[in-house]
Amino acid sequence: MDVDKELGMESVKAGASGKPEMRLGTQEETSEGDANESSLLVLSSNVPLLALEFLEIAQAKEKAFLPMVSHTFHMRTEESDASQEGDDLPKSSANTSHPKQDDSPKSSEETIQPKEGDIPKAPEETIQSKKEDLPKSSEKAIQPKESNIPKSSAKPIQPKLGNIPKASVKPSQPKEGDIPKAPEETIQSKKEDLPKSSEEAIQPKEGDIPKSSAKPIQPKLGNIAKTSVKPSQPKESDIPKSPEETIQPKEGDIPKSSAKPIQPKLGNIPKASVKPSQPKEGDISKSPEEAIQPKEGDLPKSLEEAIQPKEGDIPKSPEEAIQPKEGDIPKSLEEAIQPKEGDIPKSPEETIQPKKGDIPKSPEEAIQPKEGDIPKSPKQAIQPKEGDIPKSLEEAIPPKEIDIPKSPEETIQPKEDDSPKSLEEATPSKEGDILKPEEETMEFPEGDKVKVILSKEDFEASLKEAGERLVAVDFSATWCGPCRTIRPFFHALSVKHEDVVFLEVDADNCEEVVRECAIMCVPTFQFYKKEEKVDELCGALKEKLEAVIAELK
């Protein structure tokens, strides 16, 4: 140890003349017949600076690390041909790529070294990965121990355990033999592989270390080197984003292009020339206009269509957004049509995704239906559910148990008995009877003797005045269709039976009388004699009404 230290001191004082020879000889002795002479020459030319810095470090720390540094230094520079676990070591003039499990992608500007101890060597790059890797460059000599991060002017990159260094273009290392390659893209998919663009370096996992052409990075378990352009390190489904788009999924990378993004299930890795998109089970990558990623094999569509239906339902219309549930009702500009299970309306400008939260988004419409969602088109907003009621600009025909068409000119509301009412016309019919509007209901036969009751006192006075004669009281309402139907007949009976007193009570105007007489429905007819009720009839029953009057009088 003392001899080595003295040699170091003498070589530094005398200049850089003696040390290179000593270093070269030492390297030749430890190389054991290494044929890679170019790397030795490059390293030997850098020895003076390296020795100087190592000497300074040794003196600062009481000369304790110099032997270890020189030993590790020589050992690492000579291990290029001895890779662990039988990994192939391809070599090029500008870069060296070492992928895992026989994958060996090579580019003219890339250096990839992911695994324990792979040591590719190039004239401009030295990559050493292990706990105490010592990268060497022409300007810097850094002696890191366990997670130190040396930096050189060229590229020293040292990843450990699956670290994936990236060059200025794109390296791709897929697992299990999948090696897709595009002219501008290389996508790495292994459960957490990260696609890289020309301006991004993204490495997710416990110690991923992205790399640029101007920075050397030497991380261990979580060290995060950052490049001059964009370094992104997402962990487990983090989604880095590049100037165009870079998306990294877990389990089933799904890249998407600017025209059509297609996502296959679990492991399919389609490649586009512009965009790499990789979502995780439902991640939604977005392209300049549309990027849609459905779950479990859903297929996102082109710039104008992103349709993800459930059970094959693919509704599409030219200007509509339709989301059917077992009977959803897609609507057109003039008609409302209700398709059930399997109806496939299709539109070029809509995006329809009915299922579990899939959220496709397009520049014109983003529609997300889930079991009874409410799709809304530029001109219509329709909500159908079992017995949906579609409404169009000109027609609205909602069918449920009773058809209730509604238009600006006609409105029909049936309750037990049909009671349609409109702004201009009220035409309720029951059993063929034709009702008359209020203007006509006032036209009763000549000699009409029906008295209208306005208050409780008036009602009591009328009963007292009648004495022993039969009093027939009609409890009705103006909004009641059957009441309007039988009212003319009631007035006709008043002419026919002159010995009977006919009274008419408006249920809305005389609520006190209605409560006292316990009226439950309209029309109701009550019959009094001597101020006491003798009979009651509910409903617009003409024949029965006439029979009761004839019997009681």
From Swiss-Prot:
Its main location: cytoplasm. InterPro entries: Thioredoxin-like_sf (IPR036249), Thioredoxin_domain (IPR013766). The lineage of its organism: Eukaryota, Metazoa, Chordata, Craniata, Vertebrata. Sequence repeats lie at residues 113-127, 128-142, 143-157, 158-172, 173-187, 188-202, 203-217, 218-232, 233-247, 248-262, 263-277, 278-292, 293-307, 308-322, 323-337, 338-352, 353-367, 368-382, 383-397, 398-412, 413-427, 428-442. Pfam families: Thioredoxin (PF00085). Residues 429-553 form the Thioredoxin domain. Keywords: Cytoplasm, Developmental protein, Differentiation, Disulfide bond, Phosphoprotein, Redox-active center, Repeat, Spermatogenesis. Residues 113-442 are annotated as: 22 X 15 AA approximate tandem repeat of Q-P-K-X-G-D-I-P-K-S-[PS]-E-[KE]-X-I. Testis-specific. Only expressed during spermiogenesis, prominently in round and elongating spermatids. This is Thioredoxin domain-containing protein 2. It comes from Homo sapiens. One of its GO terms (cellular component) is cytoplasm. GO terms for molecular function: thioredoxin-disulfide reductase (NADPH) activity. PANTHER family: THIOREDOXIN-LIKE PROTEIN 1.
